[in-house]
Amino acid sequence: MPPKFDPNEVKYLYLRAVGGEVGASAALAPKIGPLGLSPKKVGEDIAKATKEFKGIKVTVQLKIQNRQAAASVVPSASSLVITALKEPPRDRKKDKNVKHSGNIQLDEIIEIARQMRDKSFGRTLASVTKEILGTAQSVGCRVDFKNPHDIIEGINAGEIEIPEN
């Protein structure tokens, strides 16, 4: 027999979802059904929480307590870089493996690095910024109209200064 349901217990679930779309409730059902939640309602909550990342795959954290689910987005570096590009959302069914050809300012990259600092293994803001620049290169965008790798080399050589706070 399963243990008694504790109303004060907090459970965390991490799911991958496409921003702004109601996920398939059939995929949610086995994960949240045993916790006493409606998959349809949770799917709508996820769609509401991810609407600013429309069309981009993001990780969603579900905090479940007392049969109430609270959805919050845990953005990855690539999703933050893609939203910083401010491209119009694409149709996922037609366009696959898209290279994003845009330009981002270095200040925006540093701002993304500040957001990702606690999740990163880099000790300094410069090292986290280099991680984000590597992500920008794999996404396919440019930074200050240059290849992101050239900016990484500039940071390593000391030509480009990254603030420490």
UniProtKB/Swiss-Prot annotation:
Primary location recorded for the protein, binned into one broad class: cytoplasm
Sites bearing N6,N6,N6-trimethyllysine, chain numbering: 4, 11
Posttranslational modification: It appears that the main modified species for L12 contains 6 methyl groups, 2 on Pro-2, 3 on Lys-4 and 1 on Arg-67. Although not reproduced with a second method, methylation at Lys-11 cannot be ruled out.
One GO-annotated biological process of the protein: ribosomal large subunit assembly
Residues with PTM Phosphoserine: 25, 38
Residue positions, PTM N,N-dimethylproline: 2
Subcellular localization: Cytoplasm
Linked residues for Glycyl lysine isopeptide (Lys-Gly) (interchain with G-Cter in ubiquitin): 130, 146
Alphabetical list of SUPFAM superfamilies matching this protein: Ribosomal L11/L12e N-terminal domain (SSF54747), Ribosomal protein L11, C-terminal domain (SSF46906)
Residues with PTM N5-methylarginine: 67
Keyword annotations from UniProtKB, A to Z: Cytoplasm, Isopeptide bond, Methylation, Phosphoprotein, Ribonucleoprotein, Ribosomal protein, RNA-binding, Ubl conjugation
Entry's Gene Ontology molecular function annotations: large ribosomal subunit rRNA binding; structural constituent of ribosome
Protein's job: Component of the ribosome, a large ribonucleoprotein complex responsible for the synthesis of proteins in the cell. The small ribosomal subunit (SSU) binds messenger RNAs (mRNAs) and translates the encoded message by selecting cognate aminoacyl-transfer RNA (tRNA) molecules. The large subunit (LSU) contains the ribosomal catalytic site termed the peptidyl transferase center (PTC), which catalyzes the formation of peptide bonds, thereby polymerizing the amino acids delivered by tRNAs into a polypeptide chain.
Family of the protein in this entry: Belongs to the universal ribosomal protein uL11 family.
Subunit and partners: Component of the large ribosomal subunit (LSU). Mature yeast ribosomes consist of a small (40S) and a large (60S) subunit. The 40S small subunit contains 1 molecule of ribosomal RNA (18S rRNA) and 33 different proteins (encoded by 57 genes). The large 60S subunit contains 3 rRNA molecules (25S, 5.8S and 5S rRNA) and 46 different proteins (encoded by 81 genes).
UniProt miscellaneous comment: Present with 68500 molecules/cell in log phase SD medium.
Name of the protein: Large ribosomal subunit protein uL11A
Organism whose genome encodes this protein: Saccharomyces cerevisiae (strain ATCC 204508 / S288c) (Baker's yeast)
